[in-house]
Amino acid sequence: MRKRDYLGQLELMVLFAVMRVNRNAYGVLISQEISKQSGRDVAIASVYAALERLEKKGLVTSCLGEPTAERGGKARTYFKPTMAGLKEARDAHGTLLRLCSGLPGLARPIA
């Protein structure tokens, strides 16, 4: 990232999901992980748009897997965080923790 380019909520969620899914992170799995962890359904097109932005910012890289018959001979695109992406995720996580620390109503679990 050239200048300080802050990530939006969806970009952060996608970056965190890529990290959670780990080696085999591709669009559908990333979308499912976001849904599982947040309870929000995210359109696959939105996930791919966020992945494209993250890749342009140098926070994730992509590579093509092997073509498979189940995908009509198409290769799946896999994503992984870069070192800059890992740093951005750590920074964002720390910022959120500091912002939320001591907030009334967040000290105990919400039922």
Please give the residue ranges for each predicted region.
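N-terminal helix-turn-helix DNA-binding core of bacterial DNA-binding proteins
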Residues: 5-46
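Exposed loop/turn and edge beta-strand positions of beta-sandwich/beta-sheet ligand-binding modules
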Residues: 75
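Short aromatic/hydrophobic contact patches that present stacked aromatics
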Residues: 15, 78-80
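Basic, short loop/linker segments at the boundary and entry of helix-turn-helix/winged-helix-like folds
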Residues: 2-7, 79
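Beta-hairpin "wing" of winged helix-turn-helix
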Residues: 57-72
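Amphipathic alpha-helical dimerization/coiled-coil segments
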Residues: 84-111
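Basic amphipathic alpha-helical segments that dock to polyanions
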Residues: 47-54
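Short, contiguous hydrophobic alpha-helices characteristic of membrane insertion segments
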Residues: 3-4, 58-59, 110
